[in-house]
Amino acid sequence: MSIRHNSRLVAIVDDDESVQSALQDLIESDGLSTLCLGSAEQFLDSEARHKAVCLIADIRMPGMSGLELQAKLKAEGCRIPIIFVTAHGDPEMRTLALGDGAVEFLTKPFNDAVLLEVVHAALERSGND
C-alpha cells in the first residue's frame, strides 16, 4: 500500500487484486498516482481518505459495500468524486449510486478510454485536473 506522490491521488477500492492491478496500471499510465485498498474499511482507515481527489470503488465487497462507503462519506460531508466499477450492473444499484452522488457507474469489463475520460471529467469538476 504505497503512494507514488503526485497531487492527484486516485484511491482504488476493490476486493479483487487483479482488478486493483488493472486499474492501477491504467490510472498510473495516465500520469496519476494511485493507492489500492482491498476494502471500504481500509480506505476509511488510510491516508487516502483525506488525500485522494477521486475514488474508484467496487459495489459488492466483503464487509462494507461501496454504496455504504458512499453514504458514510456523504454523511461526513466528504465531497470526493466516486466512480463505481462493478461486475454487478443491477439497474437499481446504478440508480441508487448515481442518485446518491456517484459520478459514474461502469460495469466490468470496462472500456479503458471511457474510464479515463470519466476520471478526468471528475477531476475537472472537482477542480483537481
Feature-to-residue mapping (PLM):
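Receiver (REC) domain active-site loop signature in two-component systems and cognate sites
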Residues: 61
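Alpha4 helix (beta4-alpha4-beta5 surface) of REC/receiver domains from two-component response regulators
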Residues: 68, 89-104
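Active-site beta3 strand of CheY-like receiver
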Residues: 50-56
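C-terminal output helix
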Residues: 92, 110-120
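Acidic catalytic/metal-coordinating carboxylates
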Residues: 38-39, 65-68
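Two-component/phosphorelay signaling modules centered on CheY-like receiver
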Residues: 17-35
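Active-site residues of response regulator receiver
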Residues: 58, 86
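Short, conserved "switch-loop" micro-motifs in signal-transduction and mechanochemical regulators
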Residues: 76, 87-89
